[in-house]
Amino acid sequence: VLDGTVDLALVGQNTRDESCVFIPFCHNELVIATPVTDHYLALKNRETPAVFHDFLKDPIIFREKGSGTKKEMDLFLERTGITTDNLNVIARMNDLESIKKSIVNGLGISILSSRSVNDLLRTKQILVFPLEEAAHKRSFYIVYSKNRILNPHVKQFVQFVRDYYM
């Protein structure tokens, strides 16, 4: 966006860059995604809701450094006083689909965007647990340069995205 290669971008983080306009268009929350096993079904079905501390010893797969999801997860961990040293991190992956397949195949759990796992949740291939803190919501933004005049078709796309998600 800044170098003019693209007119706009859809991003998961507001970098607060003064030369850009950030328009929130979609809100999402982070969830704990787990395989469907007896252990996680028991957690899901117990009377008291599962909390993140119930998952501390479980094998966890992280997103790569620089990922917006990873940054939001780091903020969540910081707010709850948990460090990565407290977790059983078994892998760091830069491909969301690989993480999802790893979860389905029982390799571990992960903290992911609820929208990114809706397909697997609908088909009952995973279980999802909410994070207990209210401050784990994430916004997505349309971003474009303040220094560029948007073409009519780009403005139309921005309006379409806003109408679709809002």
Task: Please describe what each predicted stretch is.
Residues 23, 53, 100-101, 155:
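Alpha-helical segments flanking ligand/cofactor-binding loops in enzyme cores
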Residues 127-166:
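A late-sequence structural motif
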Residues 1-34, 42-44, 104, 127-129:
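Short beta-strand-centered segments that line the small-molecule binding cleft or hinge
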